Amino acid sequence: MEWLLGKKEIKKVALVSYFYETNQTKMLIPDLERHFNWSTYMIKSLINELLHDQKRFGVPEQGQLRLSPSEREVELIPGNRAYLLSLTASYIKESYLFRTLITGMNNTPTALSVLAEHLDVPKLHLKNDIRQFNDRARPANIEINTYNRLQGDEWAIRFMLVSIFKNVIHDETELTDFFEADIIQQANQVARFYQMSNVEAAQLTQHQHLSLMIELAVWLVRLNARCPVSNSTQPHVLLADDQLDEAYKSLLILNESVIRRFVRLPPHELSLESRYGVLMLVRVGLSAGHLSGNANKEVGKVHAMLSNIAQTVYREFFGQDMPQDLTTQLANELEQPAMMLLFLTHINYQGNDDYTISHSLFPEYTLFTDRFLTRVNEYLGIKTLNIKNRLFKVFYNLFIGLLDRTVMIPQLHISLRINDAFMHKEVATMLERQAELRIDVSDDMKQCDMIISDTLLPRAQAAQVIVWTTLPTFAEFDSFLHTAVNLTMNKFTESIYGRQK
């Protein structure tokens, strides 16, 4: 979402993000200067503004940026993304372009001079921001026209608005900052209607309910603004109405009831809006498991392509076919990602999403996901990394949930040479419950990858020795985890590349 920010805000977010990317807690200002190629004055100015902004925005204290008394060192504990997310969301809310989009989504014509005065920004500045947005969004067939209204591919417009709002709204009370009271009231009425009429809707989590409210608010705003989805050139994802299963037919009927309550549309537009509503509910998590049986051939081809590539990468990594039960489970879980990929390729997605694969607790899954998405890009002939970056988190989480850790994570053999019986037992328990590792604890020093001892072992060879005289501190255990994960990853890559030679 950095394209919504001003130039200085982009630099501030980049500065904070660098701590997360490098997993560093402290950095010298000269090191930051060399990395970003910025002057000392600019670095210190940005840091002072960040210190002011985090107070102004009420950013959570945990993990806040700090400047040393000597003003030569910056400290940030990157273990909690609340700071980065809160800071970015606050900058987006204040950006002129974001506020222009909120005005434009209502489809009310507004003169540039009036809008600039309302936003308290120079007219030329706002004009340049809109021009840059149009240059960026034009490949997706979206633009802000001369009357400062959003026009173009309606499905892409709604997708963009929902994505933006989900980045800045983290509680339902914040909806009032961006939507009129009557829209929120209507969205609440529709949500309750779905919950009373659909068993799955009644079981939505709090997060899913917030997602549903954002989707509904955007949908209702665009419906009331007479911006029909018939203006979209998106592929028809679903089968014809009479070919849908009973679950989706019932959702179509529910959606038609909702639409008729607020606007009057001709039958063709009513059908398209109702079908859009079904996909909206699928994105929230309703009836997602039915998608493959109701999607058209184009989605089926994308789905089959993703499944085949995942099985191919699995075969390359482990020298065996993916088990049949896992193949079946994978096919079910790929339904929503297939629809996302189809949509992103159709609009030629050009967003620059956060994509950091360093310092993962599960580097094996990171490598698998990276290889998988690289193959997807190659198959589709995509030269850029934008779509890969956008979908990385989706597939990374999917593979962590699906692929057996006994297959993905090599076993690490650790010898414990600890004399104290209680400490020996407690350390063994600590090691064996680490989800990111598969540790075999023994007393054998000959066939081991690491040794943990409570004394020095001068004669120990061919293994890394870690000495803990007491139960480890946070820092000691964190250092051990880094070492153990790296050793495991080395074994993983050696087995893969050794097999492929």
Where are these regions (language model features)?
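A cross-family "folded-core" feature that marks the main globular domain of proteins
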Residues: 1-501
